[in-house]
A protein has these predicted regions:
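Small-residue-rich segments of transmembrane alpha-helices in multi-pass membrane proteins
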Residues: 2, 42-45, 105-121
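Cytosolic, membrane-interface loops and tails of multi-pass inner-membrane proteins
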Residues: 22-49
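Core segments of transmembrane alpha-helices
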Residues: 53-65, 113
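Interfacial loop-to-transmembrane junctions
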Residues: 90-114
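Juxtamembrane boundary at the C-terminal end of a transmembrane helix
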Residues: 120-132
Length: 140
């Protein structure tokens, strides 16, 4: 199976993480927050929270993305990946500008991630015939 589109979406997600990490490095320099400190300036803390939240979300997103590619399709996973990356980008830009405005980007990426997970779950783990066409109900 070829999962080139999913691989490209994965690389873009990693590029996004690299960019938010570099943003933290720049904020440390600009606002004079020396490592290992994670507090000290509001603008630095925003950049740091974006990086940490993105890392936290990637721990769930990447496995979901690849399971979707394997069990559904490469294209469907890649589309979900691009939407997730767009949501995370919107989240990052909004949070750095004004933390109260981060909701739209957060919801886009969250709903996309849940959709990827729900699709894989419904296709691979639920035993009912409705969810898994061509499969008999267990116990019959």
């Amino acid at each position: 199976m070829n999962q080139g589109f999913t691989a490209a979406a994965t690389l873009l997600a990693l590029l996004l993480y690299l960019i938010v990490s570099l943003n933290v490095m720049e904020a440390r320099r600009k606002y004079e927050v020396r490592a290992p400190a994670t507090t000290g300036n509001e603008h630095f803390e925003r950049a740091y929270r974006v990086q940490m939240n993105t890392l936290e979300q990637m721990a769930f997103f990447l496995p979901s993305l690849w399971l979707c590619a394997i069990f559904l399709s490469d294209l469907a996973a890649a589309i979900g990946g691009i939407v997730w990356i767009g949501g995370r980008t919107l989240y990052a830009l909004a949070y750095i500008h004004d933390p109260a405005s981060r909701g739209r980007g957060m919801m886009i990426s969250f709903v996309t991630q849940i959709a990827l997970e729900a699709d894989v779950f419904s296709r691979q783990t639920l035993p009912c015939c409705v969810c898994r066409p061509g499969r008999a109900v267990r116990g019959r």
